Amino acid sequence: MIKDERWEGVYSFEDSPYLMETLTDLRKISTENISFRKGLVRLGRYMGYELTKTMEFEKMPIQTPLEKTEGIFSKDRKNVVIITILRAAFPLMEGLIKNFESAKVGIVSASRGHAPDFKIEMNYIKVPQLNSEDTVIISDPMIATGSTLIRVLNEFKDSKPKRMLIVGVLAAPEGINAVKAEFPDVEIFVTKIDEKLNKDGYIVPGLGDAGDRAFGEPYKVSMLPQMHNLE
């Protein structure tokens, strides 16, 4: 894990050959949906493991079958809330949660419009109650313009959790700048920080639309405007 000196609290995993090889597979246009999903799970699992190293641990006495000794315990690891942004982040969350078995999970449906305004639409939020002991991890594969994450962070800023983290696959400097400008205390962990955004707001060289590549290109449902909350 490498701390990026351009920002406070921004880290990448460019020093991991395993993750760089996985990212290489994700970037390839020839990678099929199932392989793409599995790659996101692998990245989430590895990055989740690395996140545990940033948490507070305390010593505790334990009894083995032979004698008393000392172990460690992390209260932080037991107070994790993973917020997943539909739909691309599901495989990433699947990997993350393997390191945080007790984690609560929140779901946010948010989508970004096209250039030039990149308007964010958020039409579904279901997130557990948050408190000052929680470590909140927002999983979103791509930090492009940062507008989606800023909208999501604004929804939960008043809950004042212990830590707010963003975990992603790729980020553009423009997106990190935007998020940090509004939420300087938010920590960002990504596999790699790419070069820039193109005129359409996509990360380049990037890996394309993570949601489409993980689950397939969406069907254009003509009845969608008439659909209501299914709960």
UniProtKB/Swiss-Prot annotation:
Pathway(s) this gene product operates in, as recorded in its UniProt entry: Pyrimidine metabolism; UMP biosynthesis via salvage pathway; UMP from uracil: step 1/1
Cofactor mode of binding and number, as noted: Binds 1 Mg(2+) ion per subunit. The magnesium is bound as Mg-PRPP.
UniProt binding sites for uracil: 203, 208-210
Activity regulation description: Allosterically activated by GTP.
E.C. number(s) listed in UniProt: 2.4.2.9
Pfam family name, one: UPRTase
Enzyme class: transferase
Gene Ontology MF annotations: GTP binding; magnesium ion binding; uracil phosphoribosyltransferase activity
Keyword terms, alphabetized: Allosteric enzyme, Glycosyltransferase, GTP-binding, Magnesium, Nucleotide-binding, Transferase
Binding site for GTP: 38-42
Domain of life: Archaea
Record: residues binding 5-phospho-alpha-D-ribose 1-diphosphate: 87, 112, 140-148, 209
Cited function: Catalyzes the conversion of uracil and 5-phospho-alpha-D-ribose 1-diphosphate (PRPP) to UMP and diphosphate.
Name this protein carries in UniProt: Uracil phosphoribosyltransferase
Organism (species): Methanococcus maripaludis (strain C7 / ATCC BAA-1331)
